[in-house]
């Protein structure tokens, strides 16, 4: 619902059907979060980007989620295929599909877009390792080096 509704609202802000799709999509997305579905590296890194660099939460998700999905793909390729299908892009890479959606909405898609360079990656990685979300990532993250790999994907 969000994958189709958000671009329609961007193109035509007064489209009430598109707005309803976005409302319902947002509401449905809260169910898994409320029932305890764990968040992973995207939220762990995003927490640091917000706390240390003032990047808004919505922007951190737009920047980090496609990169984290690409990094996680070896661990959850089947689940990512379901995401691509739900976004009406069956057979496409889920990280790429999400990145195209984000780009089409005019949201930031890279760390450089929010003025965060490589010189900060080590500090971000070390701090993100201490969050409660990184240990719950679908593909285990055992060191800041692995988080720096993800940050490079988002550069």
Where are these regions (language model features)?
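C-terminal charged capping/lid subdomain of soluble metabolic enzymes
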Residues: 89-155
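Active-site segments that bind and position negatively charged phosphate/pyrophosphate groups
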Residues: 1-97
